[in-house]
């Protein structure tokens, strides 16, 4: 049996990403004829998993290097874009998945305006972002560990739900439902893994990618960390079990937020 791609191998040993994909797949509603844009496809893993459920997918990212990496997994329909103008015709997509992308772009309002423009009149937006607020204490720990927003490629820490409600309403969207995941234990484990990779295993990475450099970002980097990954695989069951303690924190919100919204209008004041 052929070895799974490095992206899939990382996913199989992930924590937050597994929870995210589970939520996305649980709420996935695709028709065979749907045209879907994955805006911010990164190295292609989530596109790869979701497109197996149907529809015609286009995969877009700011970074050419990300697209080169994703092409091995996705093979076709990859487009380089920018955040302020999407190179697609108006009303050309039935759904847009914008997953962990909005926090990476300077002009997030313009990005939402462009998403509205390219969606059909009954189009849907699936948006995933980091969630922030007064009680998200681990956000305050990152600077103490020497971890900056720029290490993640972030332009901002994240968003509050109320903030996104206002932004989406301004750009002609109505939130249908939302869910959060990655509570304290999952986020703490993820933070420690990011710290180990950035500060110990691979502290001198110079390549600046849209989504930072908090883990292996290419097959070459993954191969360089093969022994570390094998060691991590041994302790992964324990880390996964610890992350499930999040279920005990039923009153807390998660550090990651997913929103499902529908387009209800094309505002006249929307920037083009």
Regions found by a protein language model. Give the residues of each.
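A short glycine-rich, Lys/Arg-flanked "PGG" loop and its adjoining helix->strand segment in the class I
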Residues: 109-124
């Amino acid at each position: 049996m052929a070895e799974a791609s490095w992206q899939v191998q990382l996913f199989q040993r992930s924590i937050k990403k597994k929870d995210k994909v589970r939520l996305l797949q649980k709420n996935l509603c695709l028709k065979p004829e749907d045209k879907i844009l994955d805006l911010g496809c990164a190295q292609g893993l989530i596109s790869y998993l979701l497109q197996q459920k149907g529809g015609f997918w286009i995969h877009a990212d700011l970074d050419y290097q990300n697209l080169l990496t994703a092409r091995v997994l996705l093979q076709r329909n990859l487009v380089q874009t920018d955040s302020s103008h999407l190179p697609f015709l108006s009303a050309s997509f039935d759904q847009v998945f914008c997953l962990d992308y909005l926090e990476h772009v300077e002009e997030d309002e313009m990005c939402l305006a462009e998403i509205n423009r390219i969606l059909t009149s009954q189009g849907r937006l699936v948006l995933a972002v980091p969630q922030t607020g007064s009680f998200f204490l681990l956000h305050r720990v990152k600077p103490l560990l020497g971890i900056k927003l720029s290490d993640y490629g972030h332009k901002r820490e994240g968003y509050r739900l109320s903030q996104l409600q206002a932004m989406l309403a301004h750009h002609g969207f109505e939130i249908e439902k939302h869910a959060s995941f990655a509570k304290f234990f999952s986020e703490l484990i993820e933070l420690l893994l990011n710290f180990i990779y950035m500060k110990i295993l691979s502290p001198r990475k110079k390549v600046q990618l849209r989504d930072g450099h908090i883990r292996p970002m290419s097959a070459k980097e993954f191969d360089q960390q093969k022994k570390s990954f094998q060691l991590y695989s041994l302790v992964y069951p324990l880390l996964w079990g610890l992350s499930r303690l999040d279920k005990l924190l039923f009153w807390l919100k998660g550090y990651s937020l997913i929103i499902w919204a529908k387009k209800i209008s094309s505002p006249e004041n929307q920037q083009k």
